[in-house]
């Protein structure tokens, strides 16, 4: 299994049977390591409805015929625009041809902009992906909460955690989350895209190391073998 960081919270996860694009925000992303028009994937997985996580989902789904896997309301929102979808809800899992996806709880919000007010688009989620004998957890934009320890019981190989603060966990809370999740490895995300979420990932790595946790900092475009 290969994991490539494409910037912000977007990752390409390549399993032996499928290519999964997580939170596909490339167009308009100042940290993007790829162009949406150059991306190929078999599935699109969305943690919640905010534009910096869904930005290219509809265009990619239409171009590639790739189903969008997301919470029910978000899936229906894209289905109404012609996308193939598979709707789920937090706590539910489904066995896809490539492996299993379970949506986990996440404490955040989920909406799309529509004129002067946002449209509510279901519960924000984390993505727990099991394939090729490995487990990857994409935390979405969650805040720190105690029940992360229940998610950790899945035996996580790689946890993708936001560290940008302001909208999500900051470095301190993300390091505390590792005490609950206990993954084999953590990768920081959702930072330095804009000044409001500017962070030094080395500080997160140091806080994590003090708790006995391993961190791999990926520059946009870098790849990790899981």
Question: What do these predicted ranges mean?
Answer:
Residues 21-24, 41-49, 69-72, 137-140, ...:
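Active-site neighborhood of phospho(di)ester-bond hydrolases with catalytic His/Asp-centered motifs
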Residues 13-16, 96-97, 129-132:
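Active-site beta-strand termini and strand-to-loop segments that position acidic
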Residues 1-19, 26-29, 100-102, 203-211, ...:
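Zn-dependent metallo-beta-lactamase
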Residues 55-113, 118:
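Glycine/small-residue-rich loop that forms an oxyanion/phosphate-binding "nest" at active or ligand-binding sites
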Residues 12-50, 55-62, 73, 109-120, ...:
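Pre-active-site segment of Zn-dependent metallo-hydrolases
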Residues 28-29, 50-55, 75-78, 92-95, ...:
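Active-site environment of divalent metal-dependent phosphoester hydrolases
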Residues 113-179:
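Active-site-proximal loop/helix segments of hydrolase catalytic cores
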Residues 67, 79-93, 175, 179-226:
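Binuclear metal-ion centers of metallo-dependent hydrolases, dominated by the metallo-beta-lactamase
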């Amino acid at each position: 299994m290969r994991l490539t960081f494409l910037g912000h919270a977007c990752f390409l996860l390549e399993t032996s049977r499928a290519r999964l694009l997580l939170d596909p925000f490339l167009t308009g992303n100042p940290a993007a390591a790829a162009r949406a028009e150059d991306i190929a994937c078999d599935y699109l997985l969305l943690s919640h409805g905010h534009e910096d996580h869904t930005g290219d989902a509809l265009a990619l789904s239409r171009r590639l015929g790739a189903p969008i896997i997301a919470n029910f309301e978000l899936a229906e929102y894209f289905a109404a625009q012609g996308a193939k979808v598979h709707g789920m809800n937090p706590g539910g899992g489904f066995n896809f041809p490539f492996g299993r996806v379970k949506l986990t709880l996440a404490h955040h919000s989920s909406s799309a902009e529509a004129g002067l007010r946002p449209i509510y688009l279901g519960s924000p989620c984390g993505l727990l992906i099991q394939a090729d004998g490995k487990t990857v957890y994409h935390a979405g934009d969650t805040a720190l909460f105690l029940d992360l320890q229940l998610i950790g019981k899945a035996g996580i190989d790689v946890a993708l955690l936001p560290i940008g603060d302001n909208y999500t966990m900051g470095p301190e809370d993300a390091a505390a989350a590792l005490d609950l999740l206990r993954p084999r490895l953590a990768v920081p995300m959702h930072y330095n895209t804009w000044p409001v979420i500017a962070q030094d990932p080395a500080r997160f790595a140091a806080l994590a190391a003090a708790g006995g946790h391993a961190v791999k900092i990926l520059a946009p475009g870098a790849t990790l073998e899981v």
